[in-house]
C-alpha cells in the first residue's frame, strides 16, 4: 500500500511515532478493585502486544527500520529495570516481559545482525533470567521464566 499510495507513508510514520507512548504506558488494576478497569487493561495489553508484533513483522519485511525496533525494545527493557525495583509492580513487569518476548523472538533474525545493540539487549535478558524470585520487589517467577524462554528460543536458532 505504501508503494502504491504515497499518503500512506506519512500516516504510517505518524502512527509509529505515536506508538512509543502505548508501548511504554503500562498500568495495572486488580480485578478485585475495579473489574471494568481490569478489562480495559487487558484490552490495552492485547493491543500493545499486537502492535509490537505488527511492527516487528514490518521490520522483517523491511518496511520499518530495525533501529526503530531496537529503540522500542531497549525502552521497554530500561523501564522494566526501573519497575522491578518498585513495590507492587510485578504485574506490569510481567506484561513488559511478555511484550519483550513477542518482539525479540519474532525479530531475532534481523535483530541479532547488529551485534553491538543485540549484545546489550541479550545481556539484559540474561540478567533478568538469572535473578531470583524476590531479589527485587517486583520480580516474579513469571518474568524470570519468560526471559529464560527468550534465551531458550535464541539458543535453538543457533
Predicted region positions:
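Alpha-helical interaction scaffolds
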Residues: 1-158
Amino acid at each position: 500500500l505504501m508503494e502504491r499510495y504515497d499518503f500512506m507513508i506519512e500516516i504510517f510514520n505518524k502512527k509509529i511515532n505515536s506508538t512509543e507512548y502505548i508501548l511504554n504506558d503500562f498500568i495495572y488494576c486488580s480485578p478485585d478493585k475495579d473489574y471494568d478497569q481490569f478489562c480495559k487493561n487487558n484490552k490495552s495489553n492485547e493491543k500493545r502486544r499486537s502492535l509490537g508484533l505488527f511492527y516487528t513483522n514490518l521490520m522483517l519485511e523491511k518496511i520499518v527500520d530495525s533501529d526503530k525496533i531496537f529503540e522500542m525494545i531497549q525502552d521497554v527493557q530500561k523501564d522494566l529495570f526501573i519497575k522491578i525495583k518498585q513495590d507492587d509492580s510485578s504485574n506490569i513487569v510481567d506484561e513488559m516481559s511478555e511484550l519483550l518476548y513477542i518482539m525479540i523472538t519474532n525479530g531475532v533474525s534481523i535483530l541479532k545482525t547488529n551485534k553491538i545493540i543485540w549484545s546489550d539487549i541479550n545481556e539484559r535478558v540474561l540478567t533478568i533470567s538469572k535473578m531470583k524470585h524476590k531479589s527485587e520487589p517486583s520480580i516474579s517467577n513469571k518474568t524470570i521464566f519468560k526471559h529464560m524462554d527468550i534465551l531458550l528460543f535464541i539458543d535453538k536458532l543457533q
